[in-house]
Amino acid sequence: MNQEFSTTVSTTLVTQPLTVLSEEESLFAASVREFAEAEIKPYVREMDEAQKLRPEILAKCFELGLMGIEPGEEYGGSGGTFFMACLAIEELARVDPAVSVCVDVNNTLVINAFVNYASAGLRERYLPRLCQETIGAYCLSEAGSGSDAFALQTRAEDLGAHYRLNGRKMWITNGNEAGIFIVFANLDPAKGYKGITAFVVEKGFPGFSVGKKEDKLGIRASSTTELLFDDCLVPKENVLGEVGKGYKIAIETLNEGRIGIGAQMLGLAQGAFESALSYTKERKQFGQAIADFQGVQFQLADMAVKVEAARLMVYNAARLKDARQPFIKEAAMAKL
């Protein structure tokens, strides 16, 4: 069989490499790195030992637009992309994962849930606060419902003008810092997961309190707390999305959140690699830097390869999400 093949390469088939940033993305990432190096790095050890984030650093994150990267200016946001949010999370985690996780949860979980599911009234009431002044928390986990998230025991009861919440949430990131909470509770246990509904709870609502803060082994400046609901009254209009559709909000928002976690770990790994590389150049044995030993070079090379592989997976998942392409599998891979 004779066939003729064209030797001309069509440049229209060449797409932008995953790790090549646009000018806007590059400038944004550089500005976040500069902020992290200059204003966060000097306080990382202090915050970890105190197990508390410095309020002025969080205030600066709001000032720089890092707490609301995707929402438009009409909501006080930066009008950026999900990928840019991941760049910010990565650059912050490179210096301090505690600040990074706070920014991550606010962007990829809380704000995304409002953007995708909130009524116009809830968006207008809460998005400007989340973008400009108030940290959010995403409250799904309970003592008996971790991996099986929909086995939650927190209950909601319809009282007419209000819902009444009773129960306890565990291991909630930003628990101490947050003022706005997305809380998942079951309004009708007989319906199973179809009874789960998402509610917007504010810190000052009657019957709501923040409980014990976990004493963690790492990322200690980021608070991880329990939340207590004792006849907590929530206004009827504070249902996020539709009644009984909380499971859908939880699943789909967590898919985006997995990419954010991947970006956190990517930044942390990059920072660890840079620290290790710097140490090998300073540490001397047998009259030379240990970086000159081939065995050490092998280890550094392996580290660099793994970090770059992780970057490819995280960036790919984030860009797929922005392109409105299927990304669930890639998000799970990025988190791993």
Where are these regions (language model features)?
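A short, Trp-centered hydrophobic/proline-enriched beta-strand micro-motif
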Residues: 132-141, 184
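Short Ser/Thr-interspersed hydrophobic loop/turn segments at strand-loop and sheet-helix junctions
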Residues: 65, 89-93, 185, 201-206, ...
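Short Gly/Pro-enriched turn/cap motifs at secondary-structure boundaries
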Residues: 144-147, 171-174, 188-190, 216-223
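Alpha-helical interface subdomain recognition
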Residues: 1-105, 117-122, 133, 146-149, ...
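Flexible, small-/acidic-enriched active-site or ligand-binding loops
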Residues: 151-153, 206-235
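Short beta-strand-to-turn element immediately C-terminal to the catalytic PLP-Schiff-base lysine
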Residues: 116-118, 157, 183-187, 200-202, ...
